[in-house]
Amino acid sequence: MAKSGKKYIQALSKVDKLKSYSIDDAISLLKEIKFVKFDETIDVSVNLNLKKNHTVRDTVVLPNQFMREKRILVFAKGDKAEEAREAGAVYVGDDDLINKVKGGFSDFDVVVATPDMMKDVGKLGPILGKRGLMPNPKTQTITNDLKGTIASLKKGRTEFRANKNGVINFSVGKSSMDNNKVKENYDEFIKELLKRRPSDLKGTFVDSVYMSSTMGPSVKIDFV
């Protein structure tokens, strides 16, 4: 939805586009200029200085959760399938579940697989890849530690990744949350992101950071 209209313009007029705001001031300002009734999500957009061969992708567990619990689907057999069920996975299976997904089933938010299942799960690449759900070692979703992985996902472990333009868009809270909790989530995300700086990158890693609410204008963050 395009961000336009009188209320948006009024909100935009309160943002100094030439200023970089501290994270505390940015969160406060976004709440001050809020003009919709629903509980907006607070997002950050990070512009990275990356080369074409660079990939930035990882996961983070935010200290203050705000999203609904993810529906976890696990591809596993035998004892590992039972481990996944006991850990709280919503959907667990092997060949039958693979065929179900091939048939159009998509009522899940995250996919985990044991290594021995990947030969068959790989055939779902066109389906899962399109949604960014293909199991991957970098996101710890190809694993034999199903109990630990599922527990982490249920606590809110969330993936972040740079797109082809070197931009990461990531949600850090809701407008209804305490400012300090939003800040703690932001700080944790940035801490984990900085660990993913490519080893051969010269110069600045983070070019700029902006914060915005769902319907509101963006605010530039003073990132040092």
From Swiss-Prot:
GO terms for molecular function: rRNA binding; structural constituent of ribosome; tRNA binding. One of its GO terms (biological process) is regulation of translation. Signal peptide: none annotated. One of its GO terms (cellular component) is large ribosomal subunit. Keywords: Repressor, Ribonucleoprotein, Ribosomal protein, RNA-binding, rRNA-binding, Translation regulation, tRNA-binding. Part of the 50S ribosomal subunit. Binds directly to 23S rRNA. The L1 stalk is quite mobile in the ribosome, and is involved in E site tRNA release. Protein L1 is also a translational repressor protein, it controls the translation of the L11 operon by binding to its mRNA. Belongs to the universal ribosomal protein uL1 family. This is Large ribosomal subunit protein uL1. The gene is rplA.
